[in-house]
Amino acid sequence: MNPALAARCFLMISFAGKMTDFAVSDSFRGVVDTVSGATPLAALKQNGFTDSSVSVLHMFIGDIQGTIGETSALAILIGAAILLVFKVIDLKIPLTYIGSFAVFVILYMLGTGKGFDVNYLFSHIFGGGLMLGAWFMATDYVTTPITPRGQYVYGVCLGVLTAVFRLFGGSAEGVSYAIIFCNLLVPMIERVTRHPAFGKGGKKA
């Protein structure tokens, strides 16, 4: 289990108010204040498809309020590109994670009769901890499968669970809980997806 995520989940459950405070800069007065309010993802959870206050562009560049790691998808992608260049991570888990999450959200939109809403989809992708979790947490060497097929299965499980927690759960977020839950499934995923040993089960001469 990822110890950092386990600690974050404990703090979120125990001190939810403090963990959702964020700094807001007043450009007219030149001051920074710390307030408690709804992040774009929380507003999306509360208002659903009708929330026009959520700007996908602002969420992408980071001009929004939010907790650490969820305010700038652009900064996260730059960091992810550096990790890819130096071959610290590969694309299997992040792309499978984000892709399966997007597919589930699209099916949810179509299934609820709301129709396809690209703003709603990308608000979920750029909002919250999905980007940070996909590129920096789900790729942790110690808590992820080592088999290629297992990494794809792991990514799909992450995407589906994150979507279920976000869309049907009581909280607006679900990335941390999804990763921790899938960490517990890693031994089983590796047993199912590992290649059989060469020559195992052959007939004796």
Predicted regions located by residue number:
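Long hydrophobic alpha-helical segments that form multi-pass transmembrane helix bundles
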Residues: 1-77
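Hydrophobic core segments of alpha-helical transmembrane domains in multi-pass membrane transport
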Residues: 8-16, 75-85, 97-107, 130-137, ...
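Short juxtamembrane and helix-loop transition motifs at transmembrane-helix boundaries
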Residues: 51-63, 79-87, 109-119, 135-145
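Cytosolic-side transmembrane-helix boundaries in multi-pass membrane proteins
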Residues: 167-205
